[in-house]
Amino acid sequence: MIEVRLFATLREGRGKIVMLPAEDYPDAASIIRHLEIPFEEVAILLINGFHKKPENEVKDGDIIAIFPPVGGG
């Protein structure tokens, strides 16, 4: 299984943590598409704590963290 952790507005309608079968998702992009997250809403993508790109491969046991752009002021 792949653990996907969502943050801030990405949790809306999806939850905080989503578990997905590794064999169905060859890369982070396929997970982002499955969760119906527009790519422009992905500001930071971490795989096992390391900054990665959506085309990076994922495997069983990976922890994916997806953060949206954050504004403030």
For each of these PLM feature ranges, what is it?
Residues 1-72:
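Ubiquitin-like/PB1-type beta-grasp interaction modules and other compact soluble beta-rich domains
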